[in-house]
């Protein structure tokens, strides 16, 4: 069977490269690149995306073999009806492998048409590595790679103020645009780049905070043979996502003219303050995802839908949202939003594997759940027991688990703690909670948290997750 490429797709169009995208994963292709495809179809945007993979090169190779084309399935409720549709996305021009073709990356920096830079490198992506150097090919971190790219552009156009870029990071961290700009400026200082470059970053470039919302499980592993037979071509880059989506960009109004989302009928907003959008989405949807994942995986479940429809795990998740997340937010319309989120989790078309949510789970908990835990404890004078139970499950999940995908330093830390403390759950809890590099603070200072985590670690270890959760639910969190 022939593989999808421009020879198979009769409507293939080559657009000018206006966007550099860091990340080639399922989410960006099922969310951002789909929207760019919509802009090309319904407006005069006339632009494509050049993709850089932050790590490795295998998917870049597959992208180029398919001429940037891939099939997107959108499944779920649309305008009140269940809709399962698919389309070929024609917005990616090429993938650039930084490890084998760095010169192509440098060359793109001098493109007259390039205007936008978009990224999604997970919550752990916007960081600085003091060992990165401008001379590296490439740098280790995403911001290091980006700083080098912007410096190449600054040099190519001799500091021309009209050749700056609009940068829209999609990483789920607070003030992601501001954090990215700060990290770029840190690299500029670290590398002792001239003051003119720093001034150009400030004056010629626009860094936008943004918030993304769409569940994109990715490649349909379980049904790929049936799908391939129906499509009539082989596609190694199929993406499955839900119908619902929302993109909120905090930035000046003129961005909506350069990226004409409204004219394309897209549900993307340009706003002056995305804080309420972000807080609601990150705390409830992403927070529920991260809280359920270690509990459900240790229980033996595989998908988000399995978890929310399970009698005990589903009840645990619902009560965690209603009794611990919503009360600290103090915003209108939260109950309806929470109901909508749980209905999205139950989407019968979507198989969202919990293992995919477990990627970089420690940094995700810090961003999505730790603020709720702290605020609940401060406001109520007691601990949010379900969230603490989930936190304990997360720490136990990092015990002797070879399937974990996280920063090597994080994995090494947990390996050492679990090995050195030899099952002493109180000492394990104390060491992990005290590791400020993970949490940005010493969590042992939260009253009673260390002891409570140790209690739950003991129960999960001795009873297994099924019995531990059963006892927890029966006794309302008063397990001793």
Curated annotation (Swiss-Prot):
UniProt keyword Isomerase present: no
Family under the similarity heading: Belongs to the mannitol dehydrogenase family. UxaB subfamily.
Record-listed NAD(+) binding positions: 19-30
Pathway noted in the entry: Carbohydrate metabolism; pentose and glucuronate interconversion
Name of the protein: Altronate oxidoreductase
Other known facts: Member of the exu locus which is required for galacturonate utilization.
Keyword Membrane: no
